[in-house]
Every structure is written in structure tokens, then in C-alpha cells.
């Protein structure tokens, strides 16, 4: 099961991705995490990435694709994976398709989580994570079972992203609609796109996604 979750900031991709990970045992692959791991392990592509970053430049698409390719060759991806935050552009999406095809693989599905902009602002402003394990929470609709204690690891330390506030939501959404939303049409044309109502209760969104996945 090889998946991509699409949706604007605050749509709930992280929450739903973690539920898929827990149920199906496939890893959630973040480009940031993969990049740091490749640099730390000093893989060939990791060394290329480090040289670019040390020069103060942005890592190119071809290096990112190479890092993703290297990561999905690992044993824990043998039954599938979830791509988190990637691809972001049509160029990256096309390169990802070609990279998978070389391996004899293809995406199983692309799940779009749809949420209206005004709801996103409320969601983003209220979310926070466990500083220890990264489990996500929300002030209103996803609180820890015991106040101040992480459900997953028991930590009492939490943090909020500096850009998780109403002032930056508009800018982040504009960037999403300009760069990433064209992927919706791209994957629809390929017959891979499945849209779910991200404005429903969290468990209902999970149920809708499960309906999609069970039909693959």
C-alpha cells in the first residue's frame, strides 16, 4: 500500500497518517526526516545533500527524489509507505511516478482531505504536539486523555509550531493553493485520487479513509 495524503495545512493529514501507520504497520515518510537521516548516515546522496546545504542552497528536486528512492528501498517499506509532505509540485509528482516505475512500483492511492479555509484557521491555531514523541493534539477536538500528559509516551512537555497562528495561515494557504493543489487534478487524471470530507469528526474521517483503503 503506497499512499500520498494531500490537503492544506491543518487538514488533519498528520493525525490520519498516524492512524494508518498504527493499523497497517507501514512507515510514514517525511522528506525532512529522510534528508536528515541520509546526511547523518553519510549515504552517497546524503553527502550530496550536505554539500548543497553547507553552501547555503536549497536541496534540488533530483536530490530529494534520490533520497526518497533510497528510503523506500529499505525493508520496512516492503509492504508500502505513506509519503508525508511530498510531492509538493507537479514536477516532483512526475519525477516520483517515474522513480517508482523504475522499481516496478506505482502509487496505490492519493487521498485528499478537503477542509474549508475558515475551519483551517481554527484548527491550526489550536494544535500542538508532544515535545518528546511528536504525537499531535488540539485545544478543542483532540485533547490528551489525561490533561497535560501525552497519551503515547507519558511526557508532560508539549510545544506549538511558531507559524501555527492565524496571522500566517493566509500566507501558508496561498502557498499551498499555488504549488500543491494542482496535484489534485494531476492524480485525478491518473485515476488515483480519492477525496474525503476533512470537516467531519476525526473518527469519521478515519472511517472514510478506511473505506478507500479497503477497496484497493
Curated annotation (Swiss-Prot):
Consists of three domains, a large central CORE domain and two small peripheral domains, NMPbind and LID, which undergo movements during catalysis. The LID domain closes over the site of phosphoryl transfer upon ATP binding. Assembling and dissambling the active center during each catalytic cycle provides an effective means to prevent ATP hydrolysis. Some bacteria have evolved a zinc-coordinating structure that stabilizes the LID domain. ATP binds at residues 10-15, 127, 200. Zn(2+) binds at residues 130, 133, 150, 153. InterPro entries: Adenyl_kin_sub, Adenylat/UMP-CMP_kin, Adenylat_kinase_CS, Adenylate_kinase_lid-dom, P-loop_NTPase. It catalyses: AMP + ATP = 2 ADP. Its EC number is 2.7.4.3. GO terms for biological process: AMP salvage. AMP binds at residues 31, 36, 57-59, 85-88, 92, 160, 172. One of its GO terms (molecular function) is ATP binding. This is Adenylate kinase. Catalyzes the reversible transfer of the terminal phosphate group between ATP and AMP. Plays an important role in cellular energy homeostasis and in adenine nucleotide metabolism. It is an enzyme of class 2 (transferase). PANTHER family: NUCLEOTIDE KINASE (PTHR23359). Keywords: ATP-binding, Cytoplasm, Kinase, Metal-binding, Nucleotide biosynthesis, Nucleotide-binding, Transferase, Zinc. Belongs to the adenylate kinase family. CDD domains: ADK. Pathway: Purine metabolism; AMP biosynthesis via salvage pathway; AMP from ADP: step 1/1. The lineage of its organism: Bacteria, Pseudomonadati, Pseudomonadota, Alphaproteobacteria, Hyphomicrobiales. GO terms for cellular component: cytoplasm. Monomer. Residues 30-59 are annotated as: NMP. Residues 126-163 are annotated as: LID.
Amino acid at each position: 500500500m503506497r499512499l500520498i495524503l494531500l490537503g492544506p495545512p491543518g487538514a488533519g493529514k498528520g493525525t490520519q497518517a498516524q492512524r494508518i501507520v498504527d493499523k497497517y504497520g507501514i512507515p510514514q515518510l517525511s522528506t525532512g526526516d529522510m534528508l536528515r537521516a541520509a546526511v547523518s548516515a553519510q549515504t552517497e546522496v546524503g553527502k550530496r545533500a550536505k554539500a548543497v546545504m553547507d553552501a547555503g542552497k536549497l536541496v534540488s528536486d533530483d536530490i530529494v527524489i534520490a533520497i526518497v528512492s533510497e528510503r523506500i528501498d529499505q525493508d520496512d517499506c516492503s509492504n508500502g509507505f505513506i509519503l508525508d509532505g511530498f510531492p509538493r509540485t507537479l514536477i516532483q509528482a512526475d519525477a516520483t511516478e517515474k522513480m517508482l516505475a523504475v522499481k516496478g512500483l506505482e502509487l496505490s492511492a492519493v487521498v485528499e482531505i478537503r477542509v474549508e479555509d475558515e475551519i483551517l484557521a481554527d484548527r491550526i491555531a489550536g494544535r500542538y504536539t508532544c515535545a518528546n514523541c511528536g504525537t499531535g493534539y488540539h485545544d478543542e477536538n483532540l485533547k490528551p486523555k489525561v490533561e497535560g500528559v501525552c497519551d503515547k509516551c507519558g511526557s508532560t512537555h508539549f510545544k506549538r509550531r511558531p507559524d501555527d497562528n492565524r496571522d500566517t495561515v493566509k500566507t501558508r494557504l496561498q502557498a499551498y493553493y499555488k504549488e500543491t493543489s494542482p496535484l489534485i487534478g494531476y492524480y485525478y487524471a491518473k485515476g488515483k485520487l480519492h477525496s474525503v470530507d476533512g470537516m467531519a469528526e476525526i473518527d469519521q474521517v478515519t472511517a472514510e479513509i478506511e473505506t478507500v483503503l479497503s477497496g484497493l
